[in-house]
């Protein structure tokens, strides 16, 4: 009895496309023949993994498998009636009837070449790295063109042959009652070619799974959520087809002191009550490592902002710079000594409305408001 395809990949039946691809890559790296030379069981597992993924990654084939199981792909179960002869399975009919109606024909170029899949890589950087920019080295597990057969899938010294069933088109026509429907060629699988002597390294696929090290240029001023495209650095195409692209999705880690809004930075700085009252100065270290002095005038209130022009983030692909805003927070003294408490009580006694005009005016206005309501 054939093994369940979901069990083969080690995923749940509800697994999405991302989970399927992740499981496939992990298992393909583990059981690849290059990593297990002479191990027949590993080679068998590798083939089963490939077959399971090829079926489940295709929404139409997956729907057929979920409904009918392996019977959906057994050959010869639906009779003959397709131009060119040869047995065919339910999967072909399912694909033709529904795939053609819904525009589901797989795009192929001449010779069965297929474009490789696009890949996604998530990268996290610090705010300092986003400020200065950097060149990062990343390791990406992906399918690359087989260096033995150069992507043809055929053993060196041999070549793929034009499929005799479809004459190289990859499609054959089928009679379905009163209709004539075109379907994928059952002999070559739509490639238009057949390989009688496959490459021993890639087993006729034209590509192998390996890890590659790539350099990624992160420009100064890049923002959280930016996507960088590396053209042609995705999965290698099948049978010599063009490679897909690699997309780097960047996220900038939260900073301990700075918050970012576009090219501007904000920093909340706590100061003492006496500094806010009497005035003072302090230094802040900016992202470029330099220090900038902030002068606090006497009588500064909580929430006051001071602007340091040009001390924010670089504007992407520009010579302009954002600004840095210092937001004042006033820290109230805690755990006072007896002498400190006496001094503050004395200060309270000699204070006047002129010293605290906002609070004095507020309570006066509030009292007047409620007195008016009670009249």
Swiss-Prot record:
Keywords: Chaperone, Cytoplasm, DNA replication, Metal-binding, Repeat, Stress response, Zinc, Zinc-finger. A zinc finger (CR-type) spans 133-211. One of its GO terms (cellular component) is cytoplasm. Its cofactor is Zn(2+). Zn(2+) 2 binds at residues 163, 166, 185, 188. PROSITE patterns: DNAJ_1 (PS00636), DNAJ_2 (PS50076), ZF_CR (PS51188). GO terms for biological process: chaperone cofactor-dependent protein refolding; DNA replication; protein refolding; response to heat. CXXCXGXG motif repeats lie at residues 146-153, 163-170, 185-192, 199-206. It is found in: Cytoplasm. Binds 2 Zn(2+) ions per monomer. Its main location: cytoplasm. One of its GO terms (molecular function) is unfolded protein binding. SMART domains: DnaJ. Residues 4-69 form the J domain. The keyword Hydrolase does not apply. Zn(2+) 1 binds at residues 146, 149, 199, 202. The keyword rRNA processing does not apply. Participates actively in the response to hyperosmotic and heat shock by preventing the aggregation of stress-denatured proteins and by disaggregating proteins, also in an autonomous, DnaK-independent fashion. Unfolded proteins bind initially to DnaJ; upon interaction with the DnaJ-bound protein, DnaK hydrolyzes its bound ATP, resulting in the formation of a stable complex. GrpE releases ADP from DnaK; ATP binding to DnaK triggers the release of the substrate protein, thus completing the reaction cycle. NCBIfam families: DnaJ_bact, PRK10767.1. Belongs to the DnaJ family. The J domain is necessary and sufficient to stimulate DnaK ATPase activity. Zinc center 1 plays an important role in the autonomous, DnaK-independent chaperone activity of DnaJ. Zinc center 2 is essential for interaction with DnaK and for DnaJ activity. Homodimer. This is Chaperone protein DnaJ. It comes from Sinorhizobium medicae (strain WSM419) (Ensifer medicae).
